[in-house]
Amino acid sequence: MSELPQYKKDFLKSAIDGNILKFGSFLLKSGRTSPYFFNAGDFYRADLLNSISTAYALTIDSLPIQYDIIFGPAYKGIPLATAATIKLGQIRPRAKYAVGRVLVRDRKEAKDHGEGGNIVGAPLKGKRVLIVDDVISRCTAKREPSPRLEKEGGIVAGIVVALDRMEKLPAKDGDDSKPGPSALGELKKEYNLPIYAILTLDDIIEGIKGLVGEEDIKRTEEYREKYKATD
């Protein structure tokens, strides 16, 4: 595997140092016990927010897609998209981000007074929308924003998340020995959308060498081997 870009190394180290990326034994909603856990909601200090916003901005800056609006879905996506938009303006002050890209967010509960509705920010009609969120772990967790945006006339151009676990969805019959697709792969297929991540599980395993113990690395590699998706 090729060496990780410096911004990925920096992001990974800050996630470990800030206890956002933890190693141990964690029970997931899927019922699986994972040797690692990532919680983007723990990026609450200024230095950590700077780290994640920089990582999002540099990832977005490298994307081969065109977009007009950055969208942060409620709830975790809102601060992430906001921070990424600000950082994009800082790293490219005279480029397209400073003048042409704007931020939109939604509410989980529609407002029936004032401006009303679920969407807050710039008009979406005819605009290409880039969704910024935290983690794709199950298909159902990320399915809601696209229909909402399309209802407002937006065109979803892609999704950027902090982490792609590269993990197959739980089998309906409970037999996890069977090969299967990931949540990210199913979402790509259902909506025909490009989806990008700052880090993948492969990146984590490559990047944590020298940062965590050998036993944690071994357990994470074994978990990847057992649950890695086919897509």
Swiss-Prot record:
Pathway note: Pyrimidine metabolism; UMP biosynthesis via de novo pathway; UMP from orotate: step 1/2
GO biological process: 'de novo' pyrimidine nucleobase biosynthetic process; 'de novo' UMP biosynthetic process; pyrimidine ribonucleoside biosynthetic process
Residue numbers binding 5-phospho-alpha-D-ribose 1-diphosphate: 29, 75-76, 107-108, 111, 113, 133-141
Domain of life the protein comes from: Eukaryota
Main enzyme class: transferase
Signal sequence segment: none
GO cellular component: cytoplasm
Binding site for orotate: F37, F38, S137, R165
Molecular function as annotated in GO: orotate phosphoribosyltransferase activity
Keywords: Glycosyltransferase, Pyrimidine biosynthesis, Transferase
Family, similarity comment: Belongs to the purine/pyrimidine phosphoribosyltransferase family. PyrE subfamily.
Known function: Catalyzes the transfer of a ribosyl phosphate group from 5-phosphoribose 1-diphosphate to orotate, leading to the formation of orotidine monophosphate (OMP).
Quaternary structure (record): Homodimer.
Name of the protein this chain belongs to: Orotate phosphoribosyltransferase
Source organism of the structure: Podospora anserina
Gene expressing this chain: URA5
